[in-house]
């Protein structure tokens, strides 16, 4: 809608007849996510155009128009069936609501709506009333589709955030009263949004549980808990015109990069108008799932790279005090992986997915740090190695 240049009414008139979700599709989404190794999922409950993907008594612009298919209800039931945490993307914006007023906020608003306002076909209403509406539909989501385990708010700007724009305190209070174990990102406030390739400002914890990086992975991670979200091609929603699919190998590297820098990885799928997942998306998710079955222990429950440097040939993650995982992207020509650290106690290295031990030795040359050197025959890219040894110690040369 933002790119089409039309107003909300024209967009709804053109788009809704094409939106024909079939029953049972939400379960296929959750099942595929489970097979790919995901432990939580996030469904777009509503986006900026204001269409609610659940039945609401506060708005007629919702799934009542889709022949009775309550997508959020099916999704919530599927999450329970497959043991997945149920998260929801929830747009704070609503381009269709008559009381939503973004004037002077710096937040994106369709050009078509501004044109309609100039022509007298559309007027901005009372934004205080809109905040009441926002609270009411969010409360519907919390009460009718419980449990809501995660909320992915979107989004704010410097002059339009928090209580002023969204009555954020009341929204957060309602979430935690309904589910004290729920978590949320911090996009109810502006500083939660990514600023550039160079980094992200982190808001205080009371403004959200984690930060979000959109379409990039910060080179040094982000202080505190964070998540990187990425697409399979160049779009978030389904686009028949965009067939520039990323390879599963490239996305696995992005997953590893994210985890090795202390973050979670959220990978987006844009279903087709009937709810079917594009074949290429299915293929990519299944390939990632195959890799995760072999290497998942180096992803789940791990911490960021314990060294203060990033290796040129791969990445590291750490679990507890005894295990370091090594991901090999590009094997050096001499077949040796040099790690500038030492381990306390006995050390052993094995390939993940088996018990095959790889040779590991320590370079004790006096004029260098105590490097550990692993000699191995790399079978595939992003091969995982489990190094079992007590506390890793990074040494700097003088």
Pin down the residues of each PLM region.
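Mature catalytic domains of secreted/periplasmic carbohydrate-active enzymes
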Residues: 1-398
């Amino acid at each position: 809608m933002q790119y089409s240049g039309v107003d909300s009414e024209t967009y709804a008139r053109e788009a809704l007849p094409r939106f024909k979700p079939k029953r049972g599709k939400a379960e296929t989404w959750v099942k595929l996510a489970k097979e790919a190794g995901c432990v939580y999922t996030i469904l777009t409950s509503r986006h900026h155009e204001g269409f609610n993907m659940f039945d609401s008594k506060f708005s007629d612009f919702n799934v009542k128009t889709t022949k009775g298919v309550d997508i959020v209800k099916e999704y919530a039931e599927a999450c329970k069936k497959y043991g997945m945490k149920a998260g929801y993307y929830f747009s704070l914006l609503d381009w269709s609501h008559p009381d939503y007023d973004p004037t002077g906020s710096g937040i994106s608003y369709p050009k078509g709506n501004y044109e309609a306002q100039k022509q007298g076909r559309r007027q901005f209403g009372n934004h205080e009333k809109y905040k009441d509406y926002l609270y009411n539909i969010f409360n519907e989501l919390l009460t009718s589709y419980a449990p809501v385990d995660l909320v992915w708010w979107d989004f704010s700007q410097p002059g339009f955030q928090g209580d002023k724009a969204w009555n954020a305190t009341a929204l957060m209070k309602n979430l935690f009263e309904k589910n004290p174990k729920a978590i949320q990102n911090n996009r109810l406030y502006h500083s939660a949004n990514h600023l550039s390739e160079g980094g992200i400002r982190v808001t205080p914890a009371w403004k959200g549980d984690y930060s979000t990086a959109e379409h990039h992975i910060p080179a040094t991670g982000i202080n505190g808990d964070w998540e990187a979200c990425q697409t399979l091609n160049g779009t978030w929603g389904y686009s028949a015109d965009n067939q520039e699919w990323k390879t599963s190998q490239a996305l696995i590297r992005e997953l590893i990069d994210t985890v090795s820098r202390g973050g979670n990885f959220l990978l987006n799928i844009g279903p087709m108008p009937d709810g079917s997942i594009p074949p290429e998306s299915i293929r990519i998710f299944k390939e990632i799932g195959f890799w995760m079955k072999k290497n998942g222990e180096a992803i789940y429950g791990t911490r960021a790279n314990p060294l203060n440097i990033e290796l040129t040939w791969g990445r590291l993650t750490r679990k507890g005090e005894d295990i370091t995982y090594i991901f090999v992207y590009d094997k050096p020509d001499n077949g040796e992986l040099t790690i500038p650290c030492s381990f306390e106690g006995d050390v052993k290295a094995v390939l993940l997915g088996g018990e095959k031990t790889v040779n590991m030795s320590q370079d004790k040359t006096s004029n260098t740090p105590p490097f550990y050197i692993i000699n191995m025959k790399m079978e595939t890219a992003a091969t995982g190695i489990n190094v079992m040894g007590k506390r890793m110690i990074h040494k700097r040369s003088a």
